[in-house]
Swiss-Prot record:
Record function comment: GTPase that plays an essential role in the late steps of ribosome biogenesis.
GO MF annotations, alphabetized: ATP hydrolysis activity; GTP binding; ribosome binding
Record-linked InterPro entries: AAA+_ATPase, G_ENGA, GTP-bd, GTPase_Der, KH_dom-like, KH_dom-like_a/b, P-loop_NTPase, Small_GTP-bd
Keywords on record: GTP-binding, Nucleotide-binding, Repeat, Ribosome biogenesis
Organism phylogeny: Bacteria, Pseudomonadati, Pseudomonadota, Betaproteobacteria, Burkholderiales
Known partners and oligomeric status: Associates with the 50S ribosomal subunit.
SMART domains documented for this protein: AAA
Domain EngA-type G: residue ranges: 5-170, 186-359
Keyword hit for Cell division: no
Species of the source: Bordetella pertussis (strain Tohama I / ATCC BAA-589 / NCTC 13251)
Family indicated by similarity: Belongs to the TRAFAC class TrmE-Era-EngA-EngB-Septin-like GTPase superfamily. EngA (Der) GTPase family.
Protein name: GTPase Der
Residues that coordinate or bind GTP 2: 192-199, 239-243, 304-307
Length: 451
């Protein structure tokens, strides 16, 4: 299996990493903008230059010398992302100039063994190339590239240089996807932050079963896949926890890699997101969940270590989940103990149901009838003198299901009405566990005046 190249954005706080990240991933962000509660502080996303897709990681404000607590854990994960990324873009600030923090990060990059590092000098708009980049040669990371993340100057050239020579994954013809559907094979990624219990759950699922593995070590774009069967259903487990072989049996060891997590999500068609019941729902949980939603993967949520909580603690974690991850309201949620095997069997039933929903075939007549019933019960609101008129609906894609609605003045449909329609379609077609996307196509735009 070949993965998309990974670009890691590194730099001290306030140099423009988030602005660059948003510009690189803006075409994807629009797909999830209407999901209530989805964090806008995204750290992982998909980008594309020409025909080349890639993944982007914003490593956040990097404090390489942090020794304790959450900053130290973030620094450790950033160092791992630097080592595993295909290319690192080190962002500095043209207007602030070089400082000691930049030198510290440059030193770390040189020691990391990462062969592909591009030095991007941001906020260079209105400055001559020499003025913008001159001081940054002293960082010893090659020729600086002046850019403006805010204005878009130099971004395409920067990413084309970053990706040059990297082997992009072959275009998806859909043949393998169709074969997986015919075989009823589910590609399952079990994801979650460190020590959430991924390894325990994987070992519980695999048991002592002898499995077929496709082990392709090499670059970070290679994956380990494990095939197994349960109750006559075929699954392919895509490794994120770190699987090691003992004889003919695989054992999972707890390990966390942001990049391997994102790549496994990309390669899967169902994601099992694990949350630790004995810890707060973290920003990292929300970032991973947001990326799952962005990629359109079906998802099941497993809250692990549930057996160790009293009733008050259980209520607290449920409230916290609803508050921080309410954009995953379509997903089935399970409480489990991976260690004791409690609740694991129903988990796979929900995985199967989410997969079926993601690949559901929705007939045009039935979609249109449901659309008309929804509009009759609650018409879309007017915008000015125009009321959106919805004529018919058809399916535009699977995994996730895409419903295309045709009519007039549909540019005026608010997000609240889109969510109303989504709920109607979900209930009518039993689409639990999968994102559902709705696209409006107007036959004409009444807001454009003809000359």
């Amino acid at each position: 299996m070949s993965f998309k190249p990974v670009v890691a954005l590194v730099g001290r706080p306030n140099v423009g990493k988030s602005t660059l990240f948003n510009r690189l991933t803006r075409s994807r962000a629009a797909l999830v903008a209407d999901f209530s509660g989805l964090t806008r502080d995204r750290h992982y996303g998909e980008g594309r230059v020409g025909d080349t897709p890639f993944l982007v990681i914003d490593t956040g404000g990097f404090e390489p010398v942090a020794k304790d607590g959450i900053l130290a854990e973030m620094a450790r994960q950033t160092r791992q992302a630097i080592a595993e990324a295909d290319v690192v873009v080190f962002l500095v600030d043209a207007r602030a100039g070089v400082n000691a923090h930049d030198h510290e990060i440059a030193r770390l990059l040189r020691k990391s063994g990462q062969q592909r590092v591009l030095l991007a000098v941001n906020k260079a708009e209105g400055m001559g190339v020499g003025n913008a980049t001159g001081d940054f040669h002293e960082l010893g990371l090659g020729e600086p590239h002046p850019i403006s993340a805010a204005h878009g100057d130099g971004i395409v050239d920067l990413i084309e240089i970053a990706l040059s020579g990297l082997v992009a994954p072959p275009a998806d013809t859909g043949e393998q996807l169709e074969q997986d559907v015919v075989d009823h094979r589910i590609k399952l990624a079990i994801v979650g932050r460190p020590n959430v219990g991924k390894s325990t759950l994987i070992n519980t699922l695999l048991g002592e079963e002898r499995v077929i593995a496709f082990d392709m070590p090499g670059t970070t774009r290679d994956a380990i896949e494990i095939d197994f069967e349960r109750d006559g259903r075929k699954y392919t487990l895509i490794d994120t926890a770190g699987l090691r072989k003992r004889g003919k049996v695989f054992e999972a060891i707890e390990k966390f890699s942001v990049i391997k997590t994102l790549q496994a999500i990309e390669a899967s068609n169902v994601v099992l997101l694990m949350i630790d019941a004995q810890a707060e729902v973290s920003e990292q949980d929300a970032h991973i969940a947001g990326f799952v939603l962005e990629t359109g993967r079906a998802v099941v949520v497993a809250i692990n270590k549930w057996d160790g909580l009293d009733s008050d603690q259980r209520e607290r974690i449920e409230r916290e989940f609803q508050r921080k991850l309410r954009f995953l309201g379509f997903a089935r949620m399970h409480t489990i103990s991976a260690l004791k095997g409690q609740g694991v069997k129903p988990l796979l039933k929900s995985v199967n149901a989410a997969h079926a929903a993601a690949f559901a075939k929705l007939s045009t007549p039935r979609l249109t009838r449901e659309l008309q019933a929804a509009v009759e019960q609650q018409p879309p609101p007017r915008k000015g003198i125009f009321r959106p008129k919805m004529r018919y609906a058809h399916q535009g894609g699977q995994n996730p299901p895409l419903i295309v609605i045709h009519g007039n003045a549909l540019d005026a449909v608010p997000d609240s009405y889109r969510r109303y329609l989504e709920t109607r379609f979900r209930n009518a077609f039993d689409l639990a566990g999968t994102p559902l996307r709705i696209e409006f196509k107007s036959s004409r735009n009444p807001y454009v005046q003809e000359n």
